[in-house]
Amino acid sequence: MNSNVENLPPHIIRLVYKEVTTLTADPPDGIKVFPNEEDLTDLQVTIEGPEGTPYAGGLFRMKLLLGKDFPASPPKGYFLTKIFHPNVGPNGEICVNVLKRDWTAELGIRHVLLTIKCLLIHPNPESALNEEAGRLLLENYEEYAARARLLTEIHGGACSTSSGRAEASRDLASGASASSTDPMTPGVLGGAEGPMAKKHAGERDKKLAAKKKLDKKRALRRL
């Protein structure tokens, strides 16, 4: 995606830079911002799943994209980590009023991030982008919560501990481009360090040992 920095007036760039710098140094609780030094209009963010919700224990990557008309027009928000939530579409698009009709130029990036975090606590099924999640939230909360927890464990599970959250934050800060659905992401069920990978590694070691034993027997027969 092309940068919109060159399309923003200098005074808007200064305002964005000032707020992003403040957010990086003093972020809201459970939120971290990783500015793109080459493109201030593309903000990478992590949000910890709030306690008492099906998203607790997960760390969710998202991004905010500032358009060329910002702040007259709201930024666009996307979850990069797969999540089961009524207000998050298949492509990760976030539907929340502050990013649509309730937006005003006076609202800042901090307000947007706090609103998105609140959306994890209080989903709005009436403006659902994921209709199945919205229906379950209204008709069968236990099933909705189970589905949301499952995806949190699979895709945000690498960050269910403080050390995992720190590792994920370091990866994001260093410009890691792999999403949490990448099959090589540590902690995911099929990841490079996950249980399935360890199982395959054990089977490979057994086959290698058996081959060495067979080769040794063949060598002894030749003597």
From Swiss-Prot:
The modification Phosphoserine is found at S174. The active site is at C95. It is an enzyme of class 2 (transferase). It comes from the Eukaryota. SUPFAM superfamilies: UBC-like (SSF54495). Pathway: Protein modification; protein ubiquitination. One of its GO terms (molecular function) is ATP binding. One of its GO terms (biological process) is protein polyubiquitination. Pfam families: UQ_con. Component of the APC/C complex, composed of at least 14 distinct subunits that assemble into a complex of at least 19 chains with a combined molecular mass of around 1.2 MDa. Within this complex, directly interacts with ANAPC2 and ANAPC4. Interacts with CDC20, FZR1/CDH1 and VHL. Accepts ubiquitin from the E1 complex and catalyzes its covalent attachment to other proteins. Catalyzes 'Lys-11'-linked polyubiquitination. Acts as an essential factor of the anaphase promoting complex/cyclosome (APC/C), a cell cycle-regulated ubiquitin ligase that controls progression through mitosis. Acts by specifically elongating 'Lys-11'-linked polyubiquitin chains initiated by the E2 enzyme UBE2C/UBCH10 on APC/C substrates, enhancing the degradation of APC/C substrates by the proteasome and promoting mitotic exit. Belongs to the ubiquitin-conjugating enzyme family. This is Ubiquitin-conjugating enzyme E2 S. It comes from Rattus norvegicus. The gene is Ube2s.
